[in-house]
């Protein structure tokens, strides 16, 4: 994608996500923003019920961003901003138990942070 078209892509994506979060998309959508938020919260609750085990959750940028937004008790706009920053193959870490879920690291790429791997660093 050319630079201009990449910029246009992100601008359009941000606009659509904003409209979705405000329940302003007309026509059928696979799920509402509220349903999406609840699905992410339900997944996080299931992880918390896991008895303190180590968990590997593999996901896309949307649920990764919403998890961070929910854990930080930030507004919906934060989930959108975070989503646009999530790098492909990045690692986010949380510490959790039955009572708490806390962000430790977000969007890390230590496995790609080598000069010979810089070309592998991409965004959704």
Model-assigned labels for residue ranges:
Residues 55-63:
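Short, well-ordered beta-to-alpha junction loops that form the rim of enzyme active sites
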Residues 21-25, 45, 52, 76:
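A broad detector of the eukaryotic-type serine/threonine protein kinase catalytic domain
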Residues 1-39:
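Phosphate-handling substructures
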Residues 37, 41-48:
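Generic structural signal for well-ordered alpha-helical scaffold segments
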Residues 1-7, 34, 49-54, 69-124:
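Acidic, low-complexity terminal tails and accessory targeting/binding regions
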